[in-house]
C-alpha cells in the first residue's frame, strides 16, 4: 500500500495531482465534500455499524443502506487507510469487490 500522505483525504484514492492548496484532495468533487464534517461522521458511523469481524464484500454492505456508493466506498477507504478501524483482505486498491472487516483489538 502507499503512504497515507499520498492519498486523497476524502475518498482515499491515490493522488496523481492536488486540486486544493488547503486540503489534500484528488478532485473538485472531493474538495466540496470534505467540508461536510457532520455528513462524513454520519456515513462513517453507519459503515462501522454495518461491519463485523468476518469478511464482507463492499458491494453487499452497500446494498443494505441508502447511501451514495461513492460516499460509502470513500468512507470505507478512510476507515482502512487513515483510521485503521477496518482492514482489507487484499493489499490492492479498495473497490466494490473488496472484502473488509473490523480490526480486532
Residue ranges and their predicted role:
Residues 67-78:
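Short amphipathic alpha-helical interaction segments
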Residues 30-45:
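Short metal-binding segments enriched for Cys and/or His
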Residues 80-91:
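A short, conserved structural fragment
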Residues 60-62:
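A short acidic, leucine-rich amphipathic alpha-helix
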Residues 1-4, 16-20:
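Short, flexible, mixed-charge glycine/proline-rich loop motifs
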Residues 52-57:
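Short capping segments at the starts of secondary-structure elements
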